[in-house]
């Protein structure tokens, strides 16, 4: 059986490792670095001496093959001859005595010239890889030209036709081509590649720079500027909301319970609408108006009403929006806000919660170049600086006027400070009427009674009250909101929701009933003290029971408390502990802990701040250094000696002991009423003020006289 050299070598490379091959000299071929240049792996079998003839034959075949390569015949311009042929006699194979599949008697004969036929070549200009390998092994491929990346090659067949082949990752391809006498070359690319690479190296950085330039231009004034899609320079842009014709849906008619504040702001609105009326008298438009008041009193609502009434351009923002991640953003946004406002003058700029940037300077904490200080300095300059802000009215709101910088509050910046305080009874009635719109109310709902039971409530508190009452009515499947739902909603807001599933033992229930009865009894018999509104032993929140007193409206509005009222307040707070002592000193509980804290706080204020101590006198001590973060003193030093501190402690103890004695005297005198009231609470769990007073009248109780 005859084997061609190409067949023998291809068999060796395709894995026929049982055929030993000698070490040969590799053909000198210029190949790209990424191709594998290993052609043969010599396999030496020292234990088999019968393989020497086949080794000699293979060596001769390789020598003949290398002698007839195109490189060797290039000088004569002759075509390369076909490779030599190894002939092996099949009857000489002796597998039992040799590891080679061939016998030792192998003769090397000259190759027989054969005419190449082009009819066996594939058609088309694109060959499959398997077709390409078959053509190479049959000697029908003259040369190949690899692309620069080695993924594609172009072949030239012996008949001159050309075709392209997609090259897979085959490490044996170069070996196969070399052993079959195929000329190998690599494409160096197009002639213009060098120029293209040079231009590309310059073009890419230019495009990157142009892209960055467009992004920054977009952030400064392009589509990403004010009202745009955003950009990196938007950090310095104000985030204020602008309305050319404000449509807040709120007018002064929707604001109730703040008549004085409305009057002040209505003048500002009238100034914008009718400036000639004021300028004829030489009046100047106020530059700023600061709304001051507790949280929930309607400062922002008033600002929305101003926007709805004025009919002028309106800018609104929160002070916290000025300060961002980067240093200097606050001052930049203040400048941007006032630049836009001046372009729309006359207009109104509303800054909510201005204490976020307007805090007092000079504390020195966090360095002298504090970001907040830069922002407030820029704000001061814009409001009343060298250039002024003609036509721009600044409307601001805060619930912390004590922390604002004095330079911000002076006339010329904030000319007016409008106090928006908690509403009185008449104001609460109007607010309840506003927030009851759209709600189905029963006929027994009396706004005047609700207003008198809610002293100190702000507009937001009353809005929440009516909303909670509506939710309770819906939960109970009612079609109207009655006074019971409003009363339950009020207790829920003050003390928390009822613990309906709480398991309370009879002993604990009795103890809580006596504790609350003690508070109510002492409070009702103290002269000039608040009347009892309701007593309940239903657990709510953290409290096991509650006693509601109706504080005086006049006392709340004025904030003036007499010495007798404070002494009565301490006695009422201690009435619960005194009532628990009915069961013996060993049965008192920790339920009076909050009462003790309240008593101690009131007694210490009476001695240190109010001048109600004869030994200390009319002196305020223990004021401290103030809050260092508000620009005040860092440390809080005592301004009195240790001897004075001992006197203060003794005076506080004396006031508390006196209040305890008064509560004990009242309960011991009216012990029968205490038992009846506690029993009534155990039975009903809730006793209102009218039922409580009827019990007092029946028991012929008398007011305490010191």
UniProtKB/Swiss-Prot annotation:
PROSITE patterns: AAA. The keyword Nucleotide-binding applies. Pfam families: AAA (PF00004), AAA_lid_3 (PF17862), Peptidase_M41 (PF01434). Zn(2+) binds at residues 515, 519, 595. One of its GO terms (cellular component) is chloroplast membrane. Residues 91-120 have a biased composition (Polar residues). Keywords: ATP-binding, Cell cycle, Cell division, Chloroplast, Hydrolase, Membrane, Metal-binding, Metalloprotease, Nucleotide-binding, Plastid, Protease, Transit peptide, Transmembrane, Transmembrane helix, Zinc. Its EC number is 3.4.24.-. Gene3D superfamilies: 1.10.8.60, 3.30.720.210, P-loop containing nucleotide triphosphate hydrolases, Peptidase M41. It is a multi-pass membrane protein. GO terms for molecular function: ATP binding; ATP hydrolysis activity; ATP-dependent peptidase activity; metal ion binding; metalloendopeptidase activity. It is found in: Plastid, Chloroplast membrane. Residues 74-123 are annotated as: Disordered. The active site is at residue 516. The chain crosses the membrane at residues 54-74, 196-216. Its cofactor is Zn(2+). ATP binds at residues 293-300. Its main location: plastid. One of its GO terms (biological process) is proteolysis. Binds 1 zinc ion per subunit. In the N-terminal section; belongs to the AAA ATPase family. PANTHER family: ATP-DEPENDENT ZINC METALLOPROTEASE FTSH 1, CHLOROPLASTIC-RELATED, METALLOPROTEASE M41 FTSH. Seems to act as an ATP-dependent zinc metallopeptidase. This is ATP-dependent zinc metalloprotease FTSH, chloroplastic. It comes from Medicago sativa. The lineage of its organism: Eukaryota, Viridiplantae, Streptophyta, Embryophyta, Tracheophyta.
